[in-house]
């Protein structure tokens, strides 16, 4: 039997080798404790190294976001069910900031602000994530707005046009058709999507903030019936969700849209509506005991919206030339656009479409008030054909509104004023448009041409809509080359204008008004007043004599 010899030096060497190669499996981890919780807010102590906007993990997998970094505690917003969070529970740091998965797999889906599907159609696979808080493109990374984004709504595309990369505010009282304008704009992108051309296709993101569940469901149904869900993502934070979800939802939609924008694609994002996001952020800030300011909003509520809307841009060609167009919606009270949040967002955006409840109740839908609505940069993106036919439209409607109020107190009006009133009434009727019926740009040009060139002056007001529809059907059926030229060249040449005028005059001969009368003007019986004189006529207001 061999003798076992133990060498002290061998044992010492083996121990030294093991110690030098040993790595501990344990990790240093900060664990905090909930000191109080309620109303979707939790205060946590024991996390001295936590970052602002860092994700925290509560028991049960519930997540929270660290917002307030106080000396001895952290104020966190709970994302999800907060009823089970109690005092004394442990909280862990994740070391991550808020991010969401992004990609084409989200098209046609409904998700919550954390990027999780809520439509019952299974999980969404995505390898790419994008942080919610990212810096907006800098000045050198942008280029000017030059491409039109057609809404399909005559009143908007003719007077307050929108360009790709623009922020156009839709503002008005509740129940004035704000969501309808946004949904119609999404529906109008279907033809561009069907072309398969990435330069024409527009991916859409609809962010529902604080809306009723039935409203979100009806929007989804309308998009499905219009064939628009295949290029649309819905981010839903309904009224039943916690304030944290309503606060984050716009940033989630923006992150999804930015992913496509930086990939050289075009995006349209609708925020419906930012008033409710501001209300949710106010509730969070007050619960975190931040100092309140005007209307009890926190001091950084302007930054809340500015850093969101500044992400909408038209990127430079070096970055791919992608764009993200924003349609933020703001709800006013009693048509007061001078309140805190409306004035903030008006100053951030590139224009606004003001929807008025009085016009809506009069049956003017979309109920856009031309006098207050404006597009500051979209004019550069408007096609030449629309510029030509709609050049005088805004002025004529403004003069009509002025004359209309004046005529209510005046019994006698001169011929020019009567002609302006008659023309204005027909233009208002022409711009009316049913919901879910977007117009192609060439159809809009022909329709506006009817009004501004005087072809509707002999048509009774009640027959304007029928006359417009029948003219468009006639042109499509027998003179489609006119529409094709407008669609391809984006211009209305003199020869095309002359041809269109002849087509309309010939059509009038076979059109009968609802009372059976003809709409063909007999030139011999017409009043000796040309169109230029009618346009030049204006209302003169007598000023009071100066005080002595």
UniProtKB/Swiss-Prot annotation:
Its EC number is 7.1.2.2. It is a peripheral membrane protein. One of its GO terms (cellular component) is plasma membrane. It is found in: Cell membrane. Pfam families: ATP-synt_ab (PF00006), ATP-synt_ab_C (PF00306), ATP-synt_ab_N (PF02874). The keyword Repeat does not apply. It catalyses: ATP + H2O + 4 H(+)(in) = ADP + phosphate + 5 H(+)(out). ATP binds at residues 172-179. Keywords: ATP synthesis, ATP-binding, Cell membrane, CF(1), Hydrogen ion transport, Ion transport, Membrane, Nucleotide-binding, Translocase, Transport. The record marks 373 as: Required for activity. Its main location: membrane. CDD domains: ATP-synt_F1_alpha_C (cd18113), ATP-synt_F1_alpha_N (cd18116), F1-ATPase_alpha_CD (cd01132). Disulfide bonds: none annotated. The keyword Coiled coil does not apply. SUPFAM superfamilies: C-terminal domain of alpha and beta subunits of F1 ATP synthase (SSF47917), N-terminal domain of alpha and beta subunits of F1 ATP synthase (SSF50615), P-loop containing nucleoside triphosphate hydrolases (SSF52540). One of its GO terms (molecular function) is ATP binding. InterPro entries: ATP_synth_asu-like_sf, ATP_synth_asu_C, ATP_synth_asu_C_sf, ATP_synth_F1_a_nt-bd_dom, ATP_synth_F1_asu, ATPase_a/bsu_AS, ATPase_F1/V1/A1_a/bsu_N, ATPase_F1/V1/A1_a/bsu_N_sf. Belongs to the ATPase alpha/beta chains family. Produces ATP from ADP in the presence of a proton gradient across the membrane. The alpha chain is a regulatory subunit. This is ATP synthase subunit alpha. The gene is atpA.
